[in-house]
Amino acid sequence: MSEEEAHKTVEVDDVGVQLDEGDEEDLLEYDDELVEEQPSDARIRNVAETLMKSELPKVTVEYKDTTFLLFTSDDKNESNNPIICENAALYQRPMGEFMESIRKFMGNRFGRLAFATKELVLQLKSLDLTLFEDNVYNNHISFSDVYTIFKILKERSESNFETDIPTHLAIELSTRPRFVSRYNALVELTESSATLKNIKPFSNDETHPLIVDDNDQYTHQNTSEVIVMDIDDDVGEDSED
């Protein structure tokens, strides 16, 4: 086979096909059109994000007499409510990432110090379910899994013409002392002259700052070694379980 003949031969499914001059021109034109029509990665991502946002459910979050939207909603009545999770991908991400996004939003709005030693608690009364931020199983499920349960049960209730069916999933957000924060506060008591009578509710916010009396500190050292836990390390280990 001459060089000219080899140049006009292409392989289709490992089979060589001889092209004449007209076929070669058509093939080149087809390749150019294919390149022009092929969408870019950015366009694909934009389309995917648009589709995802259009499928996001309406979920409201109540905190301190304020109503937030968990995700973007097409409901015009809710258009003025702040949106907690602007990133639609969080709907299907592990619960740990989802919770971290809520913490970041609330911290920016109400001050990070208000949540520094607190664990987020999400109460879903319609499902009699409570989600805790530090739960070791958070990385095994997503919020999408939780909402799917609500959706299936709601649709069955509607089919059975039940009453008092919620129009959407509502969440009540609250906080509670983190175990590791309370534990470390108790460790501090063992390093002073404190007794059980000194056990008081732990607080470390702007309204009730934690005050340590230097004169009372270390007057009666406990000879036993007590381990102090780090919040970040504790959460990280839970995420890996």
Swiss-Prot record:
Keyword entries, A-Z? Cytoplasm, Meiosis, Nucleus, Ubl conjugation
Tell me the organism: Saccharomyces cerevisiae (strain ATCC 204508 / S288c)
Family, according to the entry, reads as follows: Belongs to the RMR1 family.
- The yes or no answer to whether the keyword Ubl conjugation is present is yes
- From the Swiss-Prot or TrEMBL record, give the protein name: Reduced meiotic recombination protein 1
- Extra remark: Present with 1820 molecules/cell in log phase SD medium.
User: For this protein, what post-translational modification is recorded in UniProt?
Assistant: Sumoylated.
Taken from the UniProt entry, a GO cellular component term is: cytoplasm
The entry's function note states:
Required for normal levels of gene conversion events during meiosis.
UniProt key word Transport: no
Record's superkingdom? Answer: Eukaryota
Task: Tell me the compartments it is located in.
Answer: Cytoplasm; Nucleus
The GO biological-process annotations, alphabetized, read as: meiotic gene conversion; reciprocal meiotic recombination
